[in-house]
Amino acid sequence: QRAGRRLKEAAERLRRSVFVEGQVPEGRRRSAQLHAEADEVYLRGRGQPVVLKLGVAYEGKQAVGSNRQALRERRVVAGVMPGTAFWEQASAYWGTHWDLSAVQACYLGGDGAHWVKQGLQYFPRACYRLDPFHLRRALREALSPSEETYAQVCRAIEAGDWAGVESALRQALRGRRGPARERLLRLRGYLREHWDGIVASGEAPRLGAIEAEVFHVLARRMKRHGARWSERGADHLARLLSERVDPHWRAVLGGRPLQISPGVRQATRQAVQRVMRQLEED
């Protein structure tokens, strides 16, 4: 709990220094492009669900094998907080690494939630991209990949042709009744609402990293069967887990980068595991 609290306090000090005191983060790394993605994960709470937010920023993807890619210069933020506080902490933290004024194009990805789109306010020249995982899920909830309408809609989406999307869905609606028709109507509304984030752009790279980040950083450790979380406990552990995959947090916490020996890294992993067990038992 203590280590997680220290990380939260450090993030809040950094946020206040930027958004209350008006200081400019001193990030020195320059990148023409920046990719940022964000999502939520719901945990079982004590009475009501606990909602964790996670965001990741990176410069792009690089091959690390025949079938794998890694995020270049990955920086992670997580915790239990409202959308505004999340983006203020995230932008302040990422600003300690990158010179955000040098970013020529920022691509923000997510599931279309309002709080995710709030991130557009914090990054220069940012545009929104709907996460491909959520787009595929919305399509498959209403259409079978084996039917012609699915293929027609996908082709129209790739072409940025909203009229083509509407035409295909309108044709399909003629033969639908009951729940199947309702699902198709929901799909049409979803695509219309998020069309600006769906339309393919030759300049926009493929995003789609956030689902894996949520799983590997948070969900596989915190969504254990039977575990119930307090907001404070979940927030503190989420920050610890973020620090494990993003050691740059140590620079924010201690004021300078730290050289961590393998022995200390192992001790840190064991301490995190003990904290997880204690929080689940509380």
Where are these regions (language model features)?
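Catalytic center-proximal scaffold of phosphoryl-transfer enzymes
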Residues: 1-282
